[in-house]
Curated annotation (Swiss-Prot):
Name of protein: Acetate kinase
Free-text comment on the cofactor: Mg(2+). Can also accept Mn(2+).
A single GO molecular function term of this UniProt record: magnesium ion binding
Catalytic reaction(s) noted: acetate + ATP = acetyl phosphate + ADP
Gene3D superfamilies: 3.30.420.40
Intracellular or extracellular location(s): Cytoplasm
CDD domains (UniProt xref): ASKHA_NBD_AcK_PK
Record's keyword terms, sorted: ATP-binding, Cytoplasm, Kinase, Magnesium, Metal-binding, Nucleotide-binding, Transferase
Site positions (Transition state stabilizer): 180, 241
KW Magnesium (keyword) present: yes
Pathway recorded for this protein: Metabolic intermediate biosynthesis; acetyl-CoA biosynthesis; acetyl-CoA from acetate: step 1/2
GO biological process: acetate metabolic process; acetyl-CoA biosynthetic process
Species the sequence originates in: Clostridium botulinum (strain Eklund 17B / Type B)
């Protein structure tokens, strides 16, 4: 059985075709600049040169049509016909409170996703467009929605409620939702597999450290708390997002600096975080180079990052009443040993002993244990695979 995984952005589309018998990606690709000049598809197949197509694509339907043509192309494709695609799994950023698991697409589901647009105005609209385009082109193929927010729907009220007037929750649905759920679920299950245990036996802190950052307490295989909140702006410092700050700073910037609400939103989302503190950028390779040149602001940004992760690990160990394992994943989590060492140094008292040589290893494979054998709490680096998780969730429903 082959599952096509689709992740639609506002002007881009990522895809993978996964053979579920082996769980291998037969092809993966990216379509960029949809609806604007210079539209381009880049497809990768193991053992072959990249397949690149440049042609005008007026919308996501054009893009998906090109994806399907590329997958069945006689010279560059990996399947003979679209009939080989058993189902399509769609990443949907926000499912609100209605969805605690993945669902088959129907009219009611589409209506509910549309109602969540106000909660994810940048992400849900292109997700919806992608689903509709696939339905148009593949009317007899089952479609499944896999929600970023679903994994966190197991949080209790005390974890997800904000201490605001209660009607803001009942009328406006303002609460903590959490994001990166598919990634957190994947690595929480993967670490259990690597430890030869069931996820239900473990208390795990999963650290998804990319340009966006979220940390989750996974107790018995279920999310009980997470750092991102009503939006992906909350939590620890991120690439260009501030994370948690005193909310009064917002009103201060509006009143004292004369910024509009939109300008402040732009500052907090695009000009803050590691970029804002370091003045260097969001790419950790650039931060690493700046640290090598003794750039004090780059060092400070990395210190803040490590400190905030450490605080969160400690807080979640307390919330769960114990800790068995920590997982680092995503771009920075997988490739920045200097962040991991900052996050873990000082946590020896809760049973963490880091193996420095393993921490500096680049050979991660499907998952690398970077704590010492004697470490009570096991620490792993595990490459995330959201596409495979989406495909598994899709397969379970069709």
């Amino acid at each position: 059985m082959k599952v096509l995984v689709i992740n639609c952005g506002s002007s881009s589309l990522k895809y993978q075709l996964i053979d579920m018998t082996t769980e291998d990606a037969l092809a993966e690709g990216l379509v960029e600049r949809i609806g604007i000049n210079g539209s381009i598809l880049t497809q990768k197949v193991k053992g072959r040169e990249k397949y690149i197509v440049e042609q005008p694509l007026k919308d996501h339907q054009d893009a998906i049509e090109l994806v399907l043509k590329s997958l069945i192309d006689g010279n560059h494709g990996v399947i003979k016909s679209m009939d080989e695609i058993s189902a399509v799994g769609h990443r949907v950023v926000h499912g609100g409170e209605k969805y605690s698991k993945s669902v088959l697409v129907n009219d009611e589901v589409m209506k509910n996703i549309e109602e969540c647009i106000k909660l994810a105005p940048l992400h849900n609209p292109p997700n919806i467009i992608g689903i509709k385009a696939c339905e148009e082109l593949m009317p007899n193929t089952p479609m499944v929605c896999v929600f970023d927010t679903a994994f966190h729907q197991t949080m209790s009220e005390k974890a997800y409620m904000y201490p605001l007037p209660y009607e803001y929750y009942t009328e406006d649905h303002i609460r903590k939702y959490g994001f990166h759920g598919t990634s957190h679920k994947y690595v929480a299950n993967k670490v259990a597999e690597l430890m030869k245990k069931d996820a239900s036996e473990l208390k795990t802190v999963t650290c998804h450290l990319g340009n966006g950052v979220s940390i989750t307490a996974v107790d018995g295989g279920k999310s009980i708390d997470t750092t991102m909140g009503f939006t992906p702006l909350a939590g620890t410092i991120m690439g260009s997002r501030c994370g948690d700050i005193d909310p009064a700073i917002v009103t201060y910037l509006i009143k004292e600096k004369g910024y509009s609400a939109d300008e402040v939103n732009d500052i907090l989302n695009k000009k803050s975080g590691i970029l804002g503190v370091s003045g260097v950028g969001t790419d950790f390779r650039d931060i690493r180079s700046a640290i090598g040149e003794n750039n004090k602001r780059a060092i400070l940004a990395t210190d803040i990052f490590g400190y905030q992760i450490k605080k969160q690990i400690g807080a979640y160990a307390v919330a769960m009443g114990g800790l068995d394992t920590i997982v680092f994943t995503a771009g920075i989590g997988e490739h920045a040993p200097e962040v991991r060492i900052r996050a873990l140094t000082g946590l020896e008292f809760i049973g963490i002993e880091l193996d420095e040589e393993k921490n500096n290893s680049h050979d991660i494979g499907e998952g690398l244990l970077i704590s010492k054998e004697s470490s009570k709490v096991k620490v792993y680096v595990i490459p995330t695979n959201e596409e495979l998780m989406i495909a598994k969730e899709t397969l379970a429903l069709v």
